[in-house]
């Protein structure tokens, strides 16, 4: 279960990175407003991905504790 949670978190991190790259692309094209919008979306996606990572690590820690008990 923790493994699946880590894979899900990784998927969200890749999505966030893609949004960050889209923001950079818009900025490089001179589209400041588009870059700002993509940057905000990327920030939100990063927060979601970080939350998923925290949950995955919590699951892994609990699984390890159960194994050691």
Protein language model annotation of sequence segments:
Residues 25-65:
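Short, charge-rich amphipathic interface segments used for partner binding and complex assembly
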Residues 1-26:
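N-terminal acidic leader/helix
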Residues 7, 67-69:
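A structural motif
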């Amino acid at each position: 279960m923790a493994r699946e949670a880590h894979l899900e978190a990784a998927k969200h991190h890749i999505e966030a990175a893609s949004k960050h790259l889209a923001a950079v692309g818009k900025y490089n094209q001179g589209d400041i407003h588009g870059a700002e919008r993509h940057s905000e979306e990327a920030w939100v996606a990063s927060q979601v991905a970080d939350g998923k990572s925290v949950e995955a690590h919590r699951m892994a820690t609990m699984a390890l504790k159960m194994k050691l008990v």
